[in-house]
Amino acid sequence: MADNQTTAAEPTNGRVTRVQGSVIDVEFPVGHLPDIYNALKVTIVNTSAKEEGEAKETEITLEVEQHLGDSTVRCVALKPTDGLVRGASVSDTGAPISVPVGDVTKGHVFDVSGNILNKKPDETITVSERWPIHRNPPAFDQLESKTQMFETGIKVIDLLTPYVQGGKIGLFGGAGVGKTVLIQEMIQRVAQNHGGVSVFAGVGERTREGNDLIGEMAEAGVLEKTALVFGQMDEQPGTRLRVPLTALTMAEYFRDVQNQDVLLFIDNIFRFTQAGSEVSTLLGRMPSAVGYQPNLADEMGSLQERITSTRGHSITSLQAIYVPADDYTDPAPATTFAHLDATTELSRDIASKGIYPAVDPLSSTSRILDPRYVGQAHYDCANRVKAILQRNKELQDIIALIGIDELGEEDKTTVNRARKIEQFLGQNFYVAEKFTGRPGSYVPADETIEAFTRICDGVYDDVPEQAFSGIGGIDDLEEKWHNMQKELGA
């Protein structure tokens, strides 16, 4: 594994020889060429600053991407280069971009370079340690060889699309179907039930959404358990390309030094690929399939291989994925899918029924939904639930034409059980308590399997559908049914 600390070489100064947008060429003395990925610093003088207090100088960071001969490097700027001129002095830091790590990151919002964006005026922050964002993945002999299920306590996930400890999960869903709430809930559950910490990387999405997320997380009480790194769509492509690495470096510290289980969110992983394509084009590389960068698989692999379990502790990653034009064969999502252990698809149809989390049980998948990993009982129960839901889906067109009363007895039973299963797959979230007025619930996987097995066996055929909505486990179901009977009796 790479060293935790990178020792900076003796700083060397160069000068700017070419400025073309965010691509900068810098000439250095012979024998003092900076390494690839080194961070360079250059100061831009703001000659138009007229008002009192307006910044006269701005320092920007450049990252070395290519060597051009013996004395010139080609760099990508991480901030706008307006005002940068040829001949400007550039300082080589002698090391890659390094960011703060440790408890100081919790409750704070960072940019790609590790600068704190939400520091209060009276707040004193002491950064005791910084790690470089370019690091090697864990060595093979340090990896956790055992595949374990990551229990979330969310019924639909644990039963039908179980997450892998230290695995990568793809999260699909349009606007307004509950992606943000699911992300907040997972952050809450990791802190509450796994004693872990969460890191969020906002990559190339809308600034408004990032601002809303921070506000909602503060309101839900999960901000203090989370480190956030943002490089939104108004940022330079070099910034958007490196934001996931900054967040991942912070997550690696919690895993490797503090021995914690970490949940890493990346929203949106497609924007990481898109930024890589922009940088590749700016550097003049020959494009590959559909105009993407030729090193697409290598770039994606270098990020994903660092997201893994080491002996005893893990980084589990939840990655929102945008699929261009719903084309799953596009190289960007196709390259991402190769690394995923599970997919969770949020459905607008299910959300419209008022069932949350609105996970589509038939479209969502997991590689560990296999008797070798989850056990025979779990596997059989999940398959029975899916079979009932699939049959119900097939019967919907017939029901729309002739009505449910015209179905055979077996199909009627299937439809009734499917409706109960759909309602029971919903669940109250801790972070939504103040909006719903109902307490959140954690349902152990064993209890989830037992409950759905009973529904499939017909144990609850006499219990009305309404009793299954907005509850947690078996005890909640029986208590709600008991209260409904008392009300009916009264």
From Swiss-Prot:
ATP binds at residues 173-180. One of its GO terms (cellular component) is plasma membrane. It catalyses: ATP + H2O + 4 H(+)(in) = ADP + phosphate + 5 H(+)(out). This is ATP synthase subunit beta. It comes from Bifidobacterium longum (strain NCC 2705). It is a peripheral membrane protein. It is an enzyme of class 7 (translocase). Keywords: ATP synthesis, ATP-binding, Cell membrane, CF(1), Hydrogen ion transport, Ion transport, Membrane, Nucleotide-binding, Translocase, Transport. It is found in: Cell membrane. Pfam families: ATP-synt_ab, ATP-synt_ab_N, ATP-synt_VA_C. F-type ATPases have 2 components, CF(1) - the catalytic core - and CF(0) - the membrane proton channel. CF(1) has five subunits: alpha(3), beta(3), gamma(1), delta(1), epsilon(1). CF(0) has three main subunits: a(1), b(2) and c(9-12). The alpha and beta chains form an alternating ring which encloses part of the gamma chain. CF(1) is attached to CF(0) by a central stalk formed by the gamma and epsilon chains, while a peripheral stalk is formed by the delta and b chains.
